[in-house]
Amino acid sequence: MTEHMRIPLAGVIGSPIAHSRSPALHGYWLKRYGLKGHYIPMDVAQADLREVLAAMPRMGFVGCNVTIPHKETVIALADIVTDRAALIGAANTLIFRKDGKIHADNTDGAGFTANLRQNAPDWQPQAAPAVVWGAGGAARAVIAALIEVGVPEIRLSNRSRARADALRSDFGAKVQVFDWVQAGNILEDATTVVNTTSLGMIGKPDFRVPLDALSPKAVVTDLVYTPLRTRLLAEAEAAGCRTVDGLGMLLHQAAPGFERWFGVRPEVDEDTRAAVLAT
């Protein structure tokens, strides 16, 4: 098959992978824009990752998304790593270049910002401190994005203080670390509040941080999207806050990769959201 006739392949690699909504999302976009291409979920064990990445370009893959547990590991296996992926320490989007090199990027932070700007258009992140709960890979992406949009101070709280301290050492003085017992006390005057933990997800412990100090001017977002309306979002809404669920971040972070692989920048709109929720 000649190069111009080849139908591009992309996919998502992780383990487990059955839960991923990415195949439904990319499949919807391919159909919506009438594009030739396929997007394939692949359950790849950690021990097989290097071999699989080496084989994918030969099989016709132009790139792939990366999810748990490989997002950190692929950084070491890539030939080119963007500055933001290096800062975050993880990649979620790979491009297999024609020269044989693997290009690694992280679009999670951009997806986070785009989701808030779309669903809370009056969001003014530079106006007041932000609160971030959690200190894993998602928190790193969110903090990098918040610094980029000009948040003056980030109050970080995590169940493991050591992980939060390590994150502060990477991102600098804008990040202030607080013990988990203070997670509710640090809300005063914050206008951006983000849960990056798995608390509140189906099958996980509930999110139980007191919100008494929460300002009704705050935009509150939860990266958990199963369920869409978490306990945190329900309580924040009851307190008069604008709330944004986590599904939009998933949709927006996927758009740059789709554009690179299939040549069209897809829209993230209500039709996109409905198509993914229907699966």
UniProtKB/Swiss-Prot annotation:
One of its GO terms (biological process) is amino acid biosynthetic process. This is Shikimate dehydrogenase (NADP(+)). Its EC number is 1.1.1.25. Keywords: Amino-acid biosynthesis, Aromatic amino acid biosynthesis, NADP, Oxidoreductase. Homodimer. It holds the Pfam family Shikimate_dh_N. Shikimate binds at S20, R21, S22, T67, N92, D108, Y225. NADP(+) binds at D83, G134, A135, G136, G137, A138, L223, G246. The active site is at K71. One of its GO terms (molecular function) is shikimate 3-dehydrogenase (NADP+) activity. Belongs to the shikimate dehydrogenase family. It comes from Cereibacter sphaeroides (strain ATCC 17025 / ATH 2.4.3). One of its GO terms (cellular component) is cytosol. It catalyses: shikimate + NADP(+) = 3-dehydroshikimate + NADPH + H(+). Involved in the biosynthesis of the chorismate, which leads to the biosynthesis of aromatic amino acids. Catalyzes the reversible NADPH linked reduction of 3-dehydroshikimate (DHSA) to yield shikimate (SA). Pathway: Metabolic intermediate biosynthesis; chorismate biosynthesis; chorismate from D-erythrose 4-phosphate and phosphoenolpyruvate: step 4/7. It is an enzyme of class 1 (oxidoreductase). It comes from the Bacteria. Transmembrane segments: none annotated.
